[in-house]
């Protein structure tokens, strides 16, 4: 994923995951919803929906190698993101990330398995090959790329090194057969969304439209804004006794 400008939101940039077809055409763009210090579509939610609609928020690419949907970095920790893609038929989550590679299981590693099992989907997670010009150790992210099948099994895992990679066969026929089986393990089709909808609708944690003024103009996306927004959410939830 990379940072991308949008003429509808002058002065802003979004963290964008994208998929390029063999023709060279960009066939999918997804703007990261959960970002700490950069604008998110949710920060300008009403205007973003007016322009792109909800399907533009959760795009799925129907390709010859399956129905693909991107998950950006830390968002692997947010099950709702993957679920919204699965609702739209996603079969393979392409997870571009930059994270510490560790021989011990990290919380992101655990989340990758969970997202695969919950949605009966493949997770193809690609880590960065090193980090430069930061305060972080330059080789801290070498390794850790992996392919996880729809049962939660890690098919391939790359180790550290400048020329390490991971490859495995993705069996879409088996995945689709699994999704159409009856039984306990079909966690996707057994979802009872109506039972959860009211709880989601009745609670606001991170607020929508925090960068959108009432007159439709945009606030400057300064780092301080995101920190203060998070502090106010903590204070509000603590006052309610939620945290």
Task: Label the predicted regions.
Residues 25, 43-45, 52-56, 85-86, ...:
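Glycine-rich loops and low-complexity Gly/Arg-rich segments
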Residues 39, 59, 63-64, 90, ...:
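A generic structural signal for ordered alpha-helices
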Residues 4-91, 101-114:
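Active-site catalytic loop in hydrolytic enzyme cores
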Residues 127-243:
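C-terminal beta-strand edge segments of enzyme domains
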Residues 13-14, 30, 78, 122, ...:
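Aromatic side chains
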Residues 1, 60, 155-159:
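Short, flexible, solvent-exposed loop/turn segments with mixed acidic/basic and small polar residues
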Residues 1-6, 129:
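Short beta-strand-to-loop element that shapes/binds the nucleotide-sugar donor at the catalytic cleft/hinge
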Residues 67, 73-167:
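CN hydrolase (nitrilase-like) catalytic-core segments centered on the catalytic cysteine
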